[in-house]
Each structure stands twice: as C-alpha cells, then as structure tokens.
Amino acid sequence: AASDVYKRQMEHHAILKSCEAVEKEGFYVTYIRPAENGIVRLTDIQRAVRPDTFLISVMAANNEIGTIQPVAQIGAFARRHRILFHTDAVQAYTNMDIDVNAMQIDMLSTSAHKLNGPKGIGFLYIREGCVKTPFIHGGGQERGMRSGTENTAGIIGFAKAAQTAMANKPVRTQYEMRMRDYMIHRVLTEIPFSRLNGDSRKRLPGNMNFSFQFVDGGTLIVMLDKQGICASAGSACSTGSGMPSHVLKSIGLPDELSFATVRFTINEEITRQEIDYVVNCLKNDIAQLREQSEDYQNFL
C-alpha cells in the first residue's frame, strides 16, 4: 500500500475523512502532528516519508487558528523525492501569495464561499500529467476528468469574486493585518489569563483565535451575539458537535482551554472603533463570567 503524509489533527475534515476512506481501502496513511504554534515541521515530514509514499497533503493556512504553513519548502521536498504534493488552499486563496510553479504544488483545492463568492463552487488545480484517472465518469466534461453539467452561474460568480479579491489584495491584507495586530495587542494586554492560539506572525491577515481561561466559550459567544458581535467557538463545520476542536488538540491545548476559545475574523470593512467596541465588550463579558466561575474564585 502507498503512504499519504500530512499532519493529522489540523487538516480540515474534508481531508481527514478522505484519508480515513482510503485507509479502509488498504492505503497506509501517516499522520503528522504540528508544533505548538500550529506549524508543521519539515523535518517531521522528512522522517515520516516511506519508500512507497506517493502523496503529501498539507493545508496552506488553517481555518481555525490561521497558521500559514511552509508550503514552498514542503513542495520543494516533495518534488525532490518525486512525491505528489497537494495543498488545501481554501483559506489561503486571495489572502496570501500562492504560485503553484514557485511552490512546486501539484494539486491545489479552494472554494468560492471564502472570498464572498457563491456557495457550492470551487476548483481543483491539477498539474498536467499528475492525474490520469477521471473522478466522475459520464459525459466527459472538464477534459474528461469530472463529468457532469457545469454550474455555469457558480463558475461566473466565483470568477468575479476572485477577480475582486485579487484586485485589492495588497491593500486589503495589509489593512487587515494592522487591525488584527491591534486587536491581539489589546486583548493580550488588557484581559488577564488570555492566550493567542497559533503563530503570532505566520497567520492569515484577518484571523484571531483566543482562549480565555475560566470562561465558557459557548456562553461568551451568546453574550457577544446579543451585543451585535459575530464570533465563533470553532470551525463552522463542527459547530454544535460538543467536542473539543481537533485543531486545538493537535497543538496540545487542554480541553478546558479548547472550550474557552473564541475565533474572530475581520475584513477590510472593520474599523478601529469597531475593534475597540469588541474588546471592551469582551473585557466586560469575561469579567462577568469569571465572577460566576467557581474555578476562577478558587484560583484567586
């Protein structure tokens, strides 16, 4: 059997479940754990590769904690060893620089809904010659690789969304990073027992993921919602599961902190005044929840 190498807990369930499926077909899958900052070590991939390894799949940027992976380094390693390299770029596309040739990417997948495009449409880039077997058999659409009538309206909507996102990318991402860093600084300096999950610099422009000790993240989300603030206690795919985030577990975060975690995402429309409002609400809400927390009172 062949080996498919990637970091287990941090990958999106779209990748995790696919790997579980091929394992049942007899393929050997190696799962690699990231470092505490959420970044996979190239040395760990190098150690995990077997003589029969044929595919490495690594998420370009994580949807929960925003960490950006060393895609170019992994791509170069894969190319040297004649291993196919796939990256899940759903979060990264239009938010960071991606060059499939320079990064030696063989396959790249992404989705329109992450850049204000329509839901239900995405694309899979495949370097010519990498894959010869059709995914879906039928009428031979998409050069015979994926049969079925194309979603023309979705394709056009995706193209327009991508065009718009790429046109203002430099200005937009720089602004988002300034606002992101401003909010991170305020939260970490003004709210005791708070921590930022993921790397402080190598992260998506608009992503922030905080854990607030002695606070229930779900309750905090409800309080923020009543104040007009949209936030998340995890990925949209696992909302309501009642399970701690597999991403946070992969970086060694204890379950009690996983359940005390809130994710914020900002875009170019968010103002400094709005961030100040969010941080002030956070401070008040967290103080209120900690007053009611027996663990916090015992800790004091």
Language-model features: locations:
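Structural signature of PLP-dependent enzymes
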Residues: 162-185, 195-204
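Active-site phosphate-binding strand-loop segment of PLP-dependent enzymes
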Residues: 30, 34-94
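Short, small-residue-biased leader/transition segments that mark boundaries at the very start
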Residues: 1-6
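Conserved C-terminal alpha-helix-loop-beta "cap" of PLP-dependent enzymes
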Residues: 208-263
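Conserved core segment of the aminotransferase class I/II
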Residues: 119-173
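PLP-dependent enzyme catalytic core of the Aspartate aminotransferase-like
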Residues: 243-300
